[in-house]
Regions:
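Short beta-strand/loop motif that positions the catalytic acidic residue
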Residues: 215, 221-223
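Primarily recognizes the serine-hydrolase "nucleophile elbow" in alpha/beta-hydrolase
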Residues: 123-192, 204
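Acidic catalytic loop of the alpha/beta-hydrolase fold
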Residues: 184-185, 226-230
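N-terminal cap/lid segment of alpha/beta-hydrolase-fold proteins
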Residues: 5-61
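Catalytic nucleophile-loop/oxyanion-hole region of alpha/beta-hydrolase
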Residues: 82-90, 102-140
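Mobile cap/lid helix-loop segments that gate and shape the active-site cleft of serine hydrolases
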Residues: 25-30, 181-211, 217
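C-terminal catalytic histidine-bearing segment of alpha/beta-hydrolase fold enzymes
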Residues: 232, 236, 243-295
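Short, surface-exposed "cap/lid" segments of acyl-processing enzymes
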Residues: 50, 57-93
C-alpha cells in the first residue's frame, strides 16, 4: 500500500478515483461479495432509507451484526456501487469473520439537514433489532461503524442527537466505530460541506464530543496517516478531552500507510492496518452474552 502515500491527501473526487483504481484489482483477485446479499431492504419511507444484509452459510448460534455507514461529504455516496467493491467489501469482510454485515445508505443534504443522518442510523438500527434474527444475527450484539461523514452520523447517533430517547435508541448496540470523523463543530472547523449539512446549527448542539465522553457504548476512533490535517486535529482533540474526563486515552487506531478513502477500502486486502484492530475491538465487545447497551 506504499503507493497511497504518493497521492495528494486532500479529499477530492480525484483522491477517491485514484484510491479505488489502485485497490480495486486487489479486491477483484480475492473477491469482495458475501455468499448472500439481500439488497435494498427499507427501514423508512424515503427512497434512500435502504440497507443491504450480507450473510454467509449460517452458523449454530446468532452472530454479531456489524453495520457500515458510508461517507460522501453529507451530499453524496451510496452503500453499493454496482460493479465495484463499494461497499460490498465491508459485508464480505464481516461475513468472513463469522458475523452478519449490514451496509446502509441515508438521506442527504441539502434536502435533509442535521440531524437527519443520526435519525437514519437510529432507524436502521431499530430495523436490525426487529429483523436481524431472521438472518441469523443477534439483535443484542450490534456494532455500528461509519467513515468520514458516516462517522459523523454515527457519532451523532452515539451522542443521542436527533432522538427523544437516546438510551432506548442504543438498545442492543455493543460498540461504535468512528473512522476519520469530525466531533468538534465549532465554526472554525466547518468547511463548505459542513455548512451545507449543519447550516447555522450552534456548535454546542452540533458537536458530538461532549456526548461521546458520556456515552456508555464502547467506542473506537481511527485517523489515517494521510488524512488531511483537520482530521488529525479532531483525533487529538478527542484524546485530550478523553484524558481530561476519564484519565486515560480512548481506543484509537492510527491507520498507518492509508488515506481518507483507503482506510475502509483496504478491508479484506490489507488487514494489518485496520482489519485486525477493528476485528479485535468487535470481538472484545460482542464476546459475552448481553453485551449490547441495556441488553
Amino acid at each position: 500500500m506504499a503507493m497511497l502515500g504518493a497521492l495528494d491527501p486532500a479529499i477530492t473526487p480525484e483522491l477517491a478515483q485514484s484510491t479505488w483504481a489502485l485497490l480495486t484489482p486487489f479486491h477483484e483477485k480475492v473477491g469482495y461479495t458475501a455468499p448472500k446479499i439481500d439488497r435494498d431492504l427499507t427501514y423508512g419511507d424515503d427512497p434512500r432509507q435502504r440497507l443491504d444484509v450480507h450473510t454467509g452459510d449460517g452458523g449454530h448460534e446468532p452472530a454479531p451484526v456489524v453495520v457500515f455507514v458510508h461517507g460522501g461529504g453529507f451530499v453524496a455516496g451510496d452503500k453499493h456501487v454496482p460493479g465495484t467493491p463499494r461497499y460490498d467489501l465491508f459485508g464480505a469482510w464481516a461475513v468472513r469473520r463469522g458475523w452478519i454485515g449490514v451496509t446502509m445508505t441515508y438521506r442527504l443534504a441539502p434536502e435533509h439537514r442535521w440531524p437527519a443522518g443520526a435519525q437514519d442510523v437510529a432507524s436502521a438500527v431499530a430495523w436490525i433489532r426487529n429483523n436481524i434474527e431472521g438472518y441469523g444475527g443477534d439483535p443484542g450484539k450490534i456494532v455500528v461503524a461509519g467513515n468520514s461523514a458516516g462517522a459523523v452520523h454515527v457519532a451523532d447517533y452515539m451522542a443521542g442527537h436527533g432522538t427523544a430517547d437516546p438510551a432506548g435508541s442504543l438498545a442492543g448496540v455493543a460498540g461504535g466505530v468512528l473512522l476519520s470523523g469530525i466531533y468538534d463543530l465549532a465554526p472554525a472547523n466547518r468547511g463548505q460541506l459542513e455548512h451545507v449539512y449543519y447550516g447555522d446549527t450552534p456548535a454546542e448542539q452540533a458537536s458530538t464530543l461532549p456526548g461521546l465522553l458520556d456515552c456508555q457504548v464502547p467506542l473506537l476512533f481511527t485517523v489515517a496517516e494521510f488524512d488531511p490535517p483537520n482530521f488529525h486535529a479532531q483525533a487529538a482533540g478527542v484524546v485530550a478531552a478523553w484524558q481530561a474526563r476519564h484519565g486515560r486515552t480512548p481506543d484509537l487506531v492510527w491507520v498507518e500507510g492509508h488515506n481518507h478513502m483507503s482506510t475502509i477500502a483496504s478491508l479484506g486486502i490489507d488487514e494489518t492496518a485496520l482489519g485486525v484492530p477493528l476485528a479485535r475491538f468487535i470481538e472484545r465487545h460482542t464476546a459475552k452474552e448481553g453485551t449490547g447497551a441495556h441488553a
